[in-house]
Amino acid sequence: MEVEFMLLGKKRKLGRKIEEITVGEKLSMTEKIEDKDILLYLGLTDDANPLYIQHDYASQTPFEKPIVPSIMLTGIITSAISKYLPGPGSHILSQEIDFPKPVYHYATIEFLFEVIAVTRDEHTVVISVVGSNEKNETVIQGKVKVCPPHRLEEIHGKTLDNF
């Protein structure tokens, strides 16, 4: 049974159920980090860390120029899980993420996601993620434990009679 849900007046399909996910599945995606994305993030979170936007300050640090907030990179990961693997209806239960190298403004990051465990009795999947910059340096890596969408029962007409 394929279930759809409404989002802003548009029908959307739920992500894949646990029975449809197998170890070894991969997703690759590329993200270019633009100033507008960083400014939106900083405005939304009210984060005024000078390391993220002030060139004068950043030039006096070992980073030498402004860097992308680590949590913003984590947001790209959570968005990919919500949109693609397993997709809409998924819920992140835990994450272990490292940031071995900084990401600078205007960087292009290649993300590779891979399903490394499927535990049906716990209704969880574990997805590894690695992000690399243009120099093929790993800038983000980790594992995310996800609860894929649950199978929904059809809603019958009489169910809503009391509303």
Regions found by a protein language model. Name each.
Residues 2-23, 104-163:
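HotDog/MaoC-like acyl-thioester-processing domains
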Residues 93-94, 128:
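Beta-strand segments within the central parallel beta-sheet cores of soluble alpha/beta enzyme folds
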